[in-house]
């Protein structure tokens, strides 16, 4: 749980109603992790629940036990909203792609992602973001390096000194890659074990 707030950890640990963090509910290509991480920011630590009553109960538990603060979303409050429509063809003029088309998730989480990323365009660099903002003032832009230009004209970016800890999304992808490697190693071991067994069987018959 490195990088996860104390309150979010407590909510996940102590409430069966917590479905997990938003970071665990989405699938992001490796080359877009920096962009999506920057765009979602603290929303990656959203604790996802199905119902508003569950979210309320978790908040009460955190407050009464002084276990920290957390941001919690109730999926039942998100139905019926409209997803902003982005003309993909016009984005090609400055090398942009709609973020929603690049990030995967399960159907029940999609309304949340629609609201968080529905107006977001991923672009190659800040120059492309500025060109895009001039033509589409109702959209937000993020570069692949994680620099933001909001529809309000606000830039966000830069880097601090030292090495920042790996992002939630990057760690999630690393874990998935390791699990695949372990699965592959397990299959290799099983194959060698079968071959060894076959050889031993042949030697026995001889």
Task: Describe these PLM feature segments.
Residues 190-206:
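Extended alpha-helical coiled-coil "stalk/arm" regions
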């Amino acid at each position: 749980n490195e990088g996860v707030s104390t309150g979010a950890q407590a909510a996940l640990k102590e409430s069966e109603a917590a479905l997990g963090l938003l970071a665990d509910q989405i699938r992001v290509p490796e080359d877009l992790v920096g962009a999506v991480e920057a765009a979602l920011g603290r929303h990656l630590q959203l604790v996802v629940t199905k119902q508003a009553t569950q979210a309320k109960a978790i908040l009460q538990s955190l407050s009464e036990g002084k276990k920290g603060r957390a941001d919690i979303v109730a999926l039942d409050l998100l139905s019926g909203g409209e997803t902003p429509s982005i003309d993909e063809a016009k984005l090609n003029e400055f090398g942009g792609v709609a973020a929603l088309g690049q990030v995967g998730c399960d159907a029940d989480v999609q309304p949340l992602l629609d609201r968080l990323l529905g107006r977001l365009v991923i672009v190659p660099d800040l120059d492309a973001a500025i060109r895009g903002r001039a033509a589409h003032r109702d959209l937000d832009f993020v570069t692949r390096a994680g620099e933001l230009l909001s529809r309000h004209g606000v830039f966000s970016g830069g880097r601090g000194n030292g090495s920042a800890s790996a992002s939630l999304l990057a760690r999630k992808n690393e874990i998935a890659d390791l699990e695949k490697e372990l699965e592959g190693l397990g299959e290799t071991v099983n194959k060698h074990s079968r071959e060894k067994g076959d050889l031993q069987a042949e030697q026995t018959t001889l």
